[in-house]
Regions:
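C-terminal beta-strand of the catalytic ATP-binding
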Residues: 75, 165-168
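Short, well-ordered coil/turn elements that cap or connect secondary structure elements
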Residues: 20, 46, 92, 119, ...
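Conserved Class I SAM-dependent methyltransferase catalytic core
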Residues: 101-164
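S-adenosylmethionine
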Residues: 67, 89, 138-141
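Conserved SAM/SAH cofactor-binding pocket of Class I
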Residues: 1-83
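Residue-level signal for inorganic ion chemistry
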Residues: 12, 38, 72, 88, ...
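Mobile active-site "lid"/loop adjacent to the S-adenosyl-L-methionine
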Residues: 75-105
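Glycine-rich, phosphate-binding/catalytic loops in enzymes
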Residues: 44, 84-88, 142-143
Length: 168
């Protein structure tokens, strides 16, 4: 079972579904409009995904537990607006980009809510802002003290995603 939270256009969920057809994939987003686009994209690419309106974990089925959780959530702080490319500011919905609490609101909510939706051995892979690595690592180390939590860099050497490996 795999879960994509904050799916937006569905690219992560669709890519996983096509590359790993054995996965049962669920993708959630707060925006019904984004989900409609994601669903269209999934249909056009023949990807099997269960699309749900979710607010972080609210709206997820209570009877499912996930092995893998991926997310490219809103993580940009309002203070970083000037660092953004004009095309992104012009064409991307602000709710898909910006998060409160210095861009960390989604990660804090996820760390509090996701535990009951995970299998005993699970992995979370979360895209982050290039200035957020240590903060997101700390959030998940506090929430899952037994987990291996690591930050990984992109080709430019900037923090790009945090991986949380849980083995209970």
């Amino acid at each position: 079972q795999a879960l994509d939270l904050g799916t937006g256009s569905g690219i992560l969920a669709i890519s996983l579904a096509l590359r790993h057809p054995q996965l049962q994939l669920t993708a959630g987003d707060l925006s019904p409009e984004a989900l409609a686009i994601a669903k269209e994209n999934g249909i056009s690419l023949q990807a099997t995904v269960d699309w749900l309106v979710t607010d972080v974990c609210q709206g997820l089925p209570q009877d499912r537990a996930y092995d893998l959780v991926v997310s490219n959530p809103p993580y940009i702080s309002e203070a970083e607006l000037d660092l953004m490319d004009e095309s992104v500011k012009r064409y991307e919905p602000s709710m898909a980009l910006f998060a409160e609490q210095g861009g960390l609101a989604f990660y804090r909510q996820l760390a509090k809510q996701i535990g009951s939706y995970l299998k005993p051995s699970a992995c979370l892979i979360l895209e982050i802002g290039f200035r957020q690595g240590q903060a997101v690592v700390d959030i998940f180390r506090r929430a899952f003290p037994q987990a291996k939590v690591s930050c990984h860099q992109d080709l430019n050497g900037r923090d790009r995603y945090v991986q949380v490996e849980i083995n209970e």
